[in-house]
Amino acid sequence: LLIIVLALTVFALFANRAIKKANPEEVPGPFLNVIELIVELIDGLTKSNMGKRGVRFSNYIGTLFTMVLVCNISGLFGLRPPTADYGVTLPLALITFVLIHYNGFKYEKAGHVTKLFQPVLLTPINIIGEIATPLSMSLRLFGNVLSGTVMMGLIYGLVPKLIQAFLWPVFGVLHVYFDVFSGAIQAYVFCMLTMVFIAQNFPEDEAQDRKSVV
């Protein structure tokens, strides 16, 4: 995890330096074009799922997606994916959990708490439902990434090392599926759930705005 954090930090510093040095009157280079495309995609995705008020969460969503995606595909570089450790996925889900209730208190005030007791008979279920949100998000990401890591470990363990060199195309395809394809999907799902859960506490007029954007 430390290696990935350091790599992302260096990349962020390099990107920030390139953006500051860029001349607005000149045509941006390939690197800046890619950065601009990524930022526009994240802003568009955030706005379409969270509405205008959700745009301020774009930085968090972009950082979260990048972090989870890089962690998921780190197996391609011979590293054990940090997201295969529940000690990583749970804090990520807890950050989302805090943002959900921060947003709830901001827009609903005391009503964010009182709605847990409506109706009174369903209060235990409502509380369990709130607690289940970070647990389900963290366990989903942890389980999917861990299963891919275990599968690749079993495959490498079953195939003799002398034969592995001749089966690199097969291992390449498996890594593309378990690391890249599955990793990208899990990062996308985690961020989508984050946006949906945070946005559900926005006022009703914001929900209408999201529908109009879609």
Task: Annotate each language-model stretch with its function.
Residues 1-214:
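Selective transmembrane helix interface/packing segments
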